[in-house]
From Swiss-Prot:
Matching NCBIfam families: PRK00277.1, PRK12553.1
Function according to Swiss-Prot or TrEMBL: Cleaves peptides in various proteins in a process that requires ATP hydrolysis. Has a chymotrypsin-like activity. Plays a major role in the degradation of misfolded proteins.
PROSITE patterns, sorted: CLP_PROTEASE_HIS, CLP_PROTEASE_SER
Gene from which the chain derives: clpP
Protein name, entry field: ATP-dependent Clp protease proteolytic subunit
Keywords, in A-Z order: Cytoplasm, Hydrolase, Protease, Serine protease
Species this protein is from: Bdellovibrio bacteriovorus (strain ATCC 15356 / DSM 50701 / NCIMB 9529 / HD100)
CDD domains attached to this UniProt entry: S14_ClpP_2
One Pfam family here: CLP_protease
Similarity field: Belongs to the peptidase S14 family.
Amino acid sequence: MTPQSQPQETAVALIPYVIEQTSKGERSYDIYSRLLKDRIIILGTAVTDEVANSIIAQMLFLEVDNPEKPIHLYINSPGGSVSAGLAIYDFMQFVKCDVATYCMGMAASMGSLLLTAGTKGMRYSLPNTRIMIHQPLLSGGGLSGQVTDIEIHAKELVKTKEKLTRIYETHTGRDYDTLRAAMERDNFMDPYQAKEFGLLDHVVESRKAKKG
């Protein structure tokens, strides 16, 4: 007897909708589109090419909408693709708008770099977050191929490590050697330690206390 395939359950992300009353009647928005009206972008997943493209598109839209108003980027991310993260980073520096960053939950790896890359004085964290910095990882469970190709990838990884360290150096004020030592292994910090290290500017508990 041939077993019949059973339908598999797939996780579906539930996206809330909000309804606003306008002069023309009711208008429905998914929550992320509604937040975008208030210049809020949410990075709540691992950093992938698709996520980067979406965030970059939102930043460009908000820059065109009003280049004088800041963009608010909320981050809860374990990190992800270095190239995708650097694409977001480059556009954070490219757009005319200030970019305020907010850590909620966790900002690890590329997530911490994006948190730190916010406009100086506008990098926030809630009090119970975790921030983690480390050197870039070689993706995949193993490495195979010609020795020459392995050497090429190893050299590229070293260049990437130096590039990321230099970016942290630019935004934290820490010297290169201190950062290199701090990033040698997974380095977890609470937000107060991250503030002391220069990764963020303010630890906030409520909107009533923006500076802490």
